[in-house]
Amino acid sequence: MSWLTLGELIHTTLVFATAIIFASLGGVFSEKSGVTNLGLEGLMVFGAFAAGVGGFYAEQAGLGGTSAAWVGVLSAAVFGILVSLIHAVASITFKADQVISGIVINFLAAGSTLYMVKLLFEGDGDTGRIQGFNEISIPFLVDIPIAGKAFFQAYPTTYLAILLVIIGYLTSYKTPFGLRLRSVGEHPGAADTVGIKVNRLRYIGVMISGALAGIGGATITLTTTNMFSHNTVSGQGYIAIAAMIFGKWNPLGAFGAAVFFGFSQAIRNYVQLFAWSQSIPQEIIFMLPYLLTIIVLVAAVGRSRAPAALGQLYDPSKR
């Protein structure tokens, strides 16, 4: 492998990892508050849909490609928050099973977005192509061998994802809000005793996860596919759940795991360049990221400690 190819491999890894970074970071906030969120896949699908529709109509209204793409990102975040409220109301207010509620979000996304896109685009199964984001090249730095192509020529969403990981870590471990959020996920009864509004913070955690997972879905639409269709997300939300668990519910850990899974998808593309790969069925090569997800989850069992009150319903009147 040449140095040029190595730089391109790292670059492609970050492209694939970005959506997983957003969604896994969102999952961390929800589950740190004690609310299991298996609906990341559905939230990403809704975000990808909102970004495709928002970006398309923004371009039709005369906005430039980048401006229209940011409209798509904003639309995805808002849509993600609204959909996450369904999960929050069901699991926090009405005490529904959190696992089932998250799965319902996934099924709802699969059916409703396909219906809505056909309704809005005259029976077509996609939004039509949009310009989306262009990569940003940082002058001079992009010319550095290997590192230039790898780190200094990227989509705006990649830089945003890295920034939010840093902010997410500092918020979780260095601020009063983060301490309160983690306390309601570890021991909600004790948190309630000292005056912390448990359910309010859990709502906030779920809404943050909705916004970030929605942006994760938007990232795929606006950088990789440049349109929305029913298979745009293709299981990235489930990989994000694995990244969250493998990263031990820590923003930095989730980031590292997301990059690992992004690498597994990037290497899938490069494996096909080698002659020996021609003897391997293409289906097996395309299964690689998902096989690694299963292997990582099995390896993480017993090694990752989830928040103590994760998945536990809390009723303030019964404390």
Name each region found by the language model.
Residues A213, T223-Y290:
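Transmembrane alpha-helical segments in multi-pass inner-membrane proteins
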Residues A23-S24, A48-G52, A110-L114, T158-T171, ...:
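Hydrophobic core segments of alpha-helical transmembrane domains in multi-pass membrane transport
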Residues M1-S24, T36, A50, E59-V71:
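Membrane-interfacial amphipathic/re-entrant helices at transmembrane-helix boundaries
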Residues L63-A110, Q265:
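Alpha-helical transmembrane segments within multi-pass membrane transporters and channels
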Residues E186-R200, V271-R319:
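Cytosolic-side transmembrane-helix boundaries in multi-pass membrane proteins
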Residues A150-F228, P251-L252, G256:
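Helix-loop-helix "hairpin" substructures at the membrane interface of multi-pass membrane proteins
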Residues A109-K174, A275-I285, Q312-R319:
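Transmembrane helix-bundle core of multi-pass membrane transporters
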Residues V28-A50, I92-I105, R180, T224-I239, ...:
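Short, non-helical or kinked segments that cap or interrupt transmembrane helices
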